[in-house]
Amino acid sequence: MAGSTSASLQTPYFPSSTQINPVRVDHTLPLPPAQPSLSFTQGLLVGQLSVVLLIGAFIKFFIFGEAPPPPSRGLSNRTSTHPRSYSINAASTDSSPRLLREKPSTSNILRPVPSSSTNTRSILRKTYYSATPTHPTPKHGRPRLYHSSHQPESLDWFNVLIAQTIAQYRQTAYILKDSPTSSILASLSETLNNPEKKPSFIDIIKVTDISLGEEFPIFSNCRVIAVEDPNSDGGRLQALMDVDLSDDNLSLAIETSLLLNYPKPFSAVLPVALAVSVVRFSGTLCISFVPGPRTSDQTMSPIPTPHDTTSEAIDDQSSDQSSPAQNPDGPKDAHANTSNTTDASSKHGIPKTSLAFSFLPDYRLDLSVRSLIGSRSRLQDVPKVAQLVEARVQSWFEERVVEPRVQVVGLPNIWPRMGRTGLRSSQEEPEAGSGSVEIPVMTSPGTDGVSGGGGGGGSMRGIDRGLSGREVGYEALRFRHAACGGHQNQSGRDGGRGGNEQFAMPGSMPDTVTET
């Protein structure tokens, strides 16, 4: 029994019909998904927070963000962005270097100016002004305007300078209101009663009221454009600025009579009184520099204005008031000397650059015309008369300063000279003998002025001559000159000192005065 049991344990029994197959493990089955570290609620909160942050950043940096600053015009930025070329100072590469001991010829002392120095594009590039488009469209038959891409500039500083100039003119005109030859009233009366222009049926025109106004023109929106000009290389530059003058009392009132000379002279007389006031003026002012020799046949010759006559009279008022019999035509002589100088410069072939200014045709000039016609039965503010006067004023203005007509003014010589050197009235000489400049003696309106001259013969005028006559700041010299018994020169335009004149500087010891 024991032997059979052990044999059965050692040898297992398998039925013949049963087969054992090996177990195969399939490794391609998907693994169970990993559990997320955040729950659905936490993910929703994180997503909403990120969206809020993106919206806040967009609002802060794109909507409420500051605009980028404009490109600086400082020296450091210019040096890095716009490098300058010093071709004039650089040595020439195609010619041998000149020795220091070599004496150059007279024609080679002044270094040549590049031909592109007056070119419009070269000037705009060197001044960092963008006024020319990249691809301009051609236009034939008339000058082409290149609209400026530069930002319009404010003219606040220019308004202040113009206001000071106009205020000085108004004050000078008021100071000279009683002068028989130098006042604006005399100039206007002479202009209105010119026998060559006044019709025969109009009697003598009498100016009854003049108002130079109290307000000042306001300039704004200045821009520089390039204009094609066949007479200049690369065209020419033109400055456009808007000007506006309103709410001012600029007016002129006159009285005259209409004469009926048929069938006999002065058969009937009709009194007429007119008052013209400028209500508002606005337009676009064009300013450009015109070379004289190239545009002499295209530009208009400057016409003398009352301001020119007044300025000439201011310069010569001392000589006119002291000796009217000796020099009755002082302003005319001064104007003749100026014209002779201009003719001399043109004869010598010296190019003289002029300033040309005009207004565009889209200007606005509003006038107020008041009229009174008749002696007994008077007609007041006749509409037809106002229409005729406005049309005449508009025609006068357009014939002079509206495109294509321009006013040409020659630029003065601003080269510093000792004959034109002065001292402000608020300053005094620190020492008695420190001044080497010859200062003229300013006299009272009843005597002639001594002309100071550095050889040129031009008389020097005092600073701020419109404030208190002509002796502001020079009273010490005048009185000391009178105390020394100096003899004043009666020929103020000769430029030299005549007689035994004695001058003393302020602060010096007085000389011995001989009593007679």
Swiss-Prot record:
Molecular function per GO: lipid binding
Domain SMP-LTD: 151-412
Biased composition (Gly residues): 449-460
Bias-annotated ranges (Polar residues): 74-96, 105-118, 295-312
The entry's keywords: Endoplasmic reticulum, Lipid transport, Lipid-binding, Membrane, Transmembrane, Transmembrane helix, Transport
Lumenal domain ranges by topology: 1-43
Cytoplasmic face of the membrane: 65-516
GO process terms (BP): mitochondrial genome maintenance; mitochondrion-endoplasmic reticulum membrane tethering; phospholipid transport; protein insertion into mitochondrial outer membrane
TM spans (from-to): 44-64
Subcellular localization(s) per the UniProt record: Endoplasmic reticulum membrane
Region (Disordered): 70-118, 295-349, 420-466, 485-516
Principal subcellular localization: endoplasmic reticulum
Keyword Iron-sulfur attached: no
A Pfam family that the UniProt record links to this protein: MMM1
Gene Ontology cellular component annotations, sorted alphabetically: endoplasmic reticulum membrane; ERMES complex
InterPro entries: Mmm1, MMM1_dom, SMP_LBD
Domains as described in the record: The SMP-LTD domain is a barrel-like domain that can bind various types of glycerophospholipids in its interior and mediate their transfer between two adjacent bilayers.
Function recorded in the entry: Component of the ERMES/MDM complex, which serves as a molecular tether to connect the endoplasmic reticulum (ER) and mitochondria. Components of this complex are involved in the control of mitochondrial shape and protein biogenesis, and function in nonvesicular lipid trafficking between the ER and mitochondria. The MDM12-MMM1 subcomplex functions in the major beta-barrel assembly pathway that is responsible for biogenesis of all outer membrane beta-barrel proteins, and acts in a late step after the SAM complex.
Family named by the database record: Belongs to the MMM1 family.
Protein name (database record): Maintenance of mitochondrial morphology protein 1
Name of the gene: MMM1
